[in-house]
Amino acid sequence: MNAIDRARRLLSSDGATLSVVNGKRERIYYDRGVKSLTDVLDSNRALLGGASVADKLVGKAAAMLMISGGVAEVYGEVMSDGAVETFEKFGTKYSFGTRIQGITNRDGTAPCPMEQTVKYIDDPAVAEEAIKRTQKILKLRAQGGKMKKLGFGMMRLPLLSSDQKDIDFEQVNKMVDEFLLHGFEYFDTAWMYHEHTSEIVARECLVKRYPRECFKLATKLPVFSLTCAEDMQKIFDEQCKKCGVEYFDYYLLHNLNKGDYPAVQEYDAFAFARKLKAEGKIKHYGFSFHDTPQLLDRILTEHPDAEFVQLQINYLDWESEGVQSKNCWEVARKHNKPVIVMEPVKGGTLAKVPADAEGLFRAVRPDMSVPSWAIRFAAGLDGVFMVLSGMSNLEQLEDNMSFMERFRPLNAEERLTVNKVSGVIKGTGAIACTACRYCTENCPKNIPIPDYFSLYNLHLIEGKNGWSSQFNYYEALTADHGKASDCVKCGACEGHCPQHLKIRDLLEKVSGVFES
């Protein structure tokens, strides 16, 4: 009897799912799915090299693992088209009892998670790593419990250049992997982020690389872009295509404010969201909001069906007369609506604070990073179930995960320290920009407004004798963009600013510093 026939005979044992024959060595395994294969690869990899293997069910994922382990010949009682194509591509000898188109999950309701994992992978070694990551993540999900409060905001992704579309996909992949492996699962994107590229990044770095059950995905309907009711369906369909999904876990009407709420009413955007939910195309719907607590109260009163609200909340804006974080949060609590927090670090402003403010933090908790104070402040508020952080590199991600994996709210002393730091920052005269970049869309002079405001704020912190390194960065930016002094005062930017900043006046401040 040859080796593959011996493997087939062993597979007929009661409960056997996998058998391996390599010379005189024979092994039988009983785990379902690809677990037996990954276990062998981890504990006894040499057993597979040159082996003959029989398996109850062989899909592309199992085929990739067998090839990665160096299996010589495979028999599958049931084998998928993807497995056959994979074996033929790599020249692995195979045979089967029954051939099927594809493998579903154990409920028969969706594709097998492991098959989804390797769908776009052609390298067996890469496939092995991906399968093992997915196994770990699914094991975490199976443990249950509440969703962890840190959300991956896809608004400030790492870049390879100053071009907002020039995304560093390799670094984003690493960030997504680490985020999921640490038990986090919420990803937030939007139609216009990164100049309409963010949703595509979600598809390439998340959706194509992980089974759908590994993550929660949120995106937003750009109500400010609507010209008619029919636009809503067109945009939603395009979002599904860009993200590569059949449904969204959370869907938001984006940036409701006094200027755009009439369009929401005219086109009945909430009814559209209800329709999508009834069709199973979204799981939950709500809205993000940048305006007064009075308008928020009105919207929640008129649309009690909204399941959650996304608010800008951070310790600098908590008592702000413009943003009114505290008052808006209180309105959400009055209506018993769960809250998602955006801008907890205020676009990076609260990640780098003046030295005396940082000293206050260090005196109380020298082990905690400056941004951690801002995120913990927001995450500790009643009713907050998610805090979004627009992380731009792996280091920021790792820092955030370090204190959010086992979240602990601020204590009384820490809250007092935050209040003191807020006062110090306000005393510097920093511009309250969050770098959302909504203002840059229609600037006739191509002025990178958020970048200039960031340089201005850093200059306030670092500047000595009227000079700082930010002058060099300003000069570099002006080589390809309009200067702050090029502003023609058209005001197109100010109508789009969620912070209600007087951008035209502030650009004069910027030019006064960097162009004087």
Regions found by a protein language model. Give the residues of each.
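Conserved mixed alpha/beta catalytic, RNA-binding, or beta-rich assembly cores of soluble enzyme
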Residues: 2-77, 99-117
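Structural preference for beta-strand elements that scaffold enzyme active sites
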Residues: 52, 93, 147-151, 185-186, ...
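C-terminal binding/interaction regions
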Residues: 70-72, 84-138
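N-terminal binding-site loop/beta-alpha segment at the start of enzyme catalytic domains
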Residues: 139-215, 272, 278
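Distinct, well-ordered alpha-helical segments
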Residues: 197-208, 229-240, 244, 261-271, ...
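Beta/alpha (TIM)-barrel catalytic core signal, keyed to glycine-rich beta->alpha loops juxtaposed to Asp/Glu
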Residues: 256-434, 438-447, 451-454, 462-472, ...
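Local cysteine-cluster metal-coordination motifs and their immediate loop/turn environment
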Residues: 431-446, 483-500
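Short Fe-S-cluster ligation motifs
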Residues: 461-490, 516
